[in-house]
C-alpha cells in the first residue's frame, strides 16, 4: 500500500498583502486585496536573516486551506 503524499506547496494559497499593524511575537495584521484583515506570522527564513517588516510593507503570504484566518509571511517586497 502506498500513501498519497500531498506536497505542502501545492496545498498553500500564495497572495500579496499589505502589513497594517505590528503585533507581539513576530505577528502582524495584514490586509488582503479584498480588504479582509488576517493575522500572519514570519517564516523561519525571514526570522533567521533578520529582515525587518514594518507597517505599510507589501508582503507575500501563504494561506492554509484549513485555516484561512492565519497566514505565513514568506517574502517582503522592496
Curated annotation (Swiss-Prot):
It comes from Onion yellows phytoplasma (strain OY-M). Pfam families: eIF-1a. Belongs to the IF-1 family. One of its GO terms (molecular function) is translation initiation factor activity. InterPro entries: NA-bd_OB-fold, RNA-binding_domain_S1_IF1, TIF_IF1. GO terms for cellular component: cytosol. The keyword rRNA-binding applies. It is found in: Cytoplasm. Keywords: Cytoplasm, Initiation factor, Protein biosynthesis, RNA-binding, rRNA-binding. The keyword RNA-binding applies. One of the essential components for the initiation of protein synthesis. Stabilizes the binding of IF-2 and IF-3 on the 30S subunit to which N-formylmethionyl-tRNA(fMet) subsequently binds. Helps modulate mRNA selection, yielding the 30S pre-initiation complex (PIC). Upon addition of the 50S ribosomal subunit IF-1, IF-2 and IF-3 are released leaving the mature 70S translation initiation complex. Component of the 30S ribosomal translation pre-initiation complex which assembles on the 30S ribosome in the order IF-2 and IF-3, IF-1 and N-formylmethionyl-tRNA(fMet); mRNA recruitment can occur at any time during PIC assembly. This is Translation initiation factor IF-1. Residues 2-78 form the S1-like domain. The lineage of its organism: Bacteria, Bacillati, Mycoplasmatota, Mollicutes, Acholeplasmatales.
Amino acid at each position: 500500500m502506498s500513501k498519497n503524499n500531498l506536497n505542502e506547496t501545492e496545498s498553500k494559497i500564495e497572495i500579496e498583502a499589505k502589513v497594517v499593524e505590528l503585533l507581539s511575537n513576530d505577528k502582524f495584521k495584514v490586509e488582503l486585496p479584498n480588504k479582509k484583515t488576517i493575522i500572519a506570522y514570519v517564516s523561519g527564513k525571514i526570522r533567521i536573516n533578520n529582515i525587518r517588516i514594518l507597517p505599510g510593507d507589501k508582503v507575500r503570504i501563504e494561506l492554509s486551506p484549513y485555516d484561512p484566518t492565519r497566514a505565513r509571511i514568506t517574502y517582503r517586497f522592496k
